[in-house]
């Protein structure tokens, strides 16, 4: 959703980030509540003084009949790095130094402090690890070293270190003093660097597959044919606790990492992971089809990309009728300019967007898509 604002209405993107900045005091309270430094932004946020508003329970469990416990508010902490990354992308696209000096630098430093204090040292492995989390895939709870979470945390800490170095090189001593007074991060540079250098970052195994978390690749398989092709909802047959014991994804996780940071791994690794995780993903989140669609487009899988794009575009138009409770605005990412620079994928006129924007350059993109209604 943020991308669609950033590359069509950057002032709207600025307001979204400004809202997050106004919630920073509550985010610092939440981090302290869990014994951490810095700031931990809420998974679900409302008014700026509300803090975390994620409910602790949901609908009745299909197996037990009891309310489903909801752990996202305490475990889906990758939102912290996601917000920091959004700040980075905003500055990268707009060169809005005033915003960074007023809000952005502070947000990135505070979130970096959280990650550095959240990581736990494993003496046997000689590395820092992040335990008890939910990555983007919400059918995997209480996991350790989720790839998306750890790589984004690593980026967050390293970006904070890069900011401190740039400001020092630019002679911004007054700004550094102000940031130290607000965050205490300037004097913790060596401490943060140690965490960044030793944080566990899951690597591809012998097959080239990046472990979604420490347990995922060792879990048994589940035949997903009835759910991927038969139209059945997996939560009508299993509860989330059961699904945590299988190689089943609710939504893009490793593929989300590869979509957000495609330069982390070579294309052959991206392809292997796309194929592996697409086969195990039931796309029960409206935010999943679009991520897989963009990744397939980057890989030159034109028909696959367009098939998934149509599914994403039809979330509020096809069966299910869940849009009565609100439309799925996050799918705007699939229709927006995804960074600047365009790579045309030849084949059926499909176009995807790729690249890194130059500072100060914005694109307004108007995409007209004709979806044909075909007779069955």
Mark where each language-model region is.
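Active-site core of glycosidic bond-cleaving carbohydrate-active enzymes
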Residues: 1-26, 76, 80-85, 102, ...
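Helix-terminus loop motifs that line ligand-binding clefts
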Residues: 11-85, 91, 97-102, 111, ...
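Terminal accessory carbohydrate-recognition/targeting modules of carbohydrate-active enzymes
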Residues: 301, 344-376
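Conserved functional hotspot residues or short segments at active or partner-binding sites
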Residues: 108
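Short beta-alpha connecting loops at secondary-structure transitions
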Residues: 134-145, 316-328
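Acidic/polar loop patches that form or flank catalytic/metal-binding clefts of enzymes
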Residues: 12-17, 28-31, 162-174, 304, ...
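Acidic/histidine-rich catalytic neighborhood
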Residues: 114-183
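Short coil/turn linking the two alpha-helices of tandem helical-hairpin repeats
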Residues: 91-92, 300
């Amino acid at each position: 959703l943020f991308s669609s604002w950033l590359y069509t209405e950057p002032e709207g993107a600025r307001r979204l980030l400004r809202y997050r900045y106004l919630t920073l005091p509550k985010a610092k309270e939440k981090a302290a509540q869990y014994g951490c430094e810095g700031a931990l932004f809420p998974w679900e946020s409302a008014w700026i003084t509300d803090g975390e508003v994620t409910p602790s329970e949901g609908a009745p469990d299909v197996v037990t009949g009891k309310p489903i416990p909801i752990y996202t508010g305490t475990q889906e902490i990758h939102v912290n790095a996601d917000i920091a990354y959004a700040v980075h992308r905003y500055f990268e696209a707009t060169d809005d130094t005033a915003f960074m000096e007023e809000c952005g630098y502070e947000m990135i430093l505070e979130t970096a402090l959280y990650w550095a204090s959240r990581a736990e040292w494993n003496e046997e492995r000689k590395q820092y690890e992040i335990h008890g989390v939910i990555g983007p895939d919400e059918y995997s709870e209480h996991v350790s070293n989720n790839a998306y979470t750890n790589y984004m945390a690593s980026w967050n800490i390293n970006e904070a270190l890069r900011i401190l170095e740039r400001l020092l090189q630019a002679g911004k001593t007054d700004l550094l003093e102000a940031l130290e007074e607000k965050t205490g991060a300037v004097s913790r540079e060596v401490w943060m660097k140690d965490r960044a250098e030793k944080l566990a970052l899951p690597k591809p195994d012998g097959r080239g597959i990046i472990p979604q978390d420490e347990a995922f690749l060792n879990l048994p398989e589940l035949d997903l044919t009835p759910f991927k092709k038969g139209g059945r909802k997996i939560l009508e047959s299993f509860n989330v606790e059961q699904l945590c014991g299988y190689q089943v994804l609710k939504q893009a996780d490793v593929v989300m990492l590869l979509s957000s940071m495609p330069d982390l791994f070579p294309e052959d690794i991206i392809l292997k992971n796309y194929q592996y995780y697409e086969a195990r993903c039931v796309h029960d989140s409206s935010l999943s089809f679009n991520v897989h669609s963009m990744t397939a487009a980057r890989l030159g899988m034109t028909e696959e990309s367009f098939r998934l794009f149509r599914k994403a575009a039809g979330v509020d138009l096809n069966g299910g009728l869940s849009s009565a409770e609100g439309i799925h605005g996050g799918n705007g990412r699939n229709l927006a300019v995804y960074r600047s620079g365009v790579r045309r994928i030849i084949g059926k006129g499909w176009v995807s967007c790729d690249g890194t924007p130059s500072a100060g350059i914005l694109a307004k993109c108007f995409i007209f898509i004709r979806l044909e209604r075909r007779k069955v």
